[in-house]
């Protein structure tokens, strides 16, 4: 059978069309492979762990939500909580009689038992402490009337701001600070005493950094706050440097376990240099106090 020109043209057209289709299919397949390769490389350059996402977390919160007010107007007066009790002459005499060994664990290896206090100083509130501790897990404050010391000359503040938009939830927050030895007390805020059980002088306190600055234990299950502030007033505890170390440990524990960010009294990120500067302020205050006594 003889093939004419028309048949040849049809055959050539079919071959050309098949070649075009094959070339297009080859290019599409090659493009898919190249796209997949690029996506894999892009993913490989992503942050290795969730730590990177946590670093970016605070920026998103600060851009979309106003940072909680942490100035002194939002905090309760530190003249009373930082120094709830003035030591009577009796404890001084008791300290000469001997030393008392504490059986309760002391956070941050704090040992303030060198100077014993009058054993009966907290006897009046023993029953209240037991009852309130069974109900809330927090110690009640002594009911004995006390004389307040002069207002604080120095206040060391460490704030913990939640990275979560929902803030710190009441039950988790309460559990965390109870583990650090803080107990609910006067002014409806938490205080850290020498003893983990809530006895002894107040070392430092923790307030709600958002107005009105207090906590409601009766509604703690529905409570939440964007930030809390730990503060230590000077003059205050007899051993301010050790008390400050305990406060730093409690703030770090809260920030680590509840995903918070540490801030100083200027609302800047708390650094090792800032902590050292706080310690230097304590040293300078003690030096001035000694000079005034002379």
From Swiss-Prot:
Disulfide bonds: none
Alphabetized SUPFAM superfamilies for the sequence: Cell-division protein ZipA, C-terminal domain (SSF64383)
Biased composition (Basic and acidic residues): 82-91
UniProt keyword annotation of Thylakoid present: no
A cellular-component GO term for this protein: plasma membrane
Transmembrane intervals: 2-22
Compartment(s) of residence: Cell inner membrane
SMART domains membership: ZipA_C
Any one of the GO BP annotations: division septum assembly
Domain of life the protein comes from: Bacteria
Record-stated family: Belongs to the ZipA family.
NCBIfam families assigned: septum_zipA (TIGR02205)
Protein's name in the database: Cell division protein ZipA
Organism: Pseudomonas entomophila (strain L48)
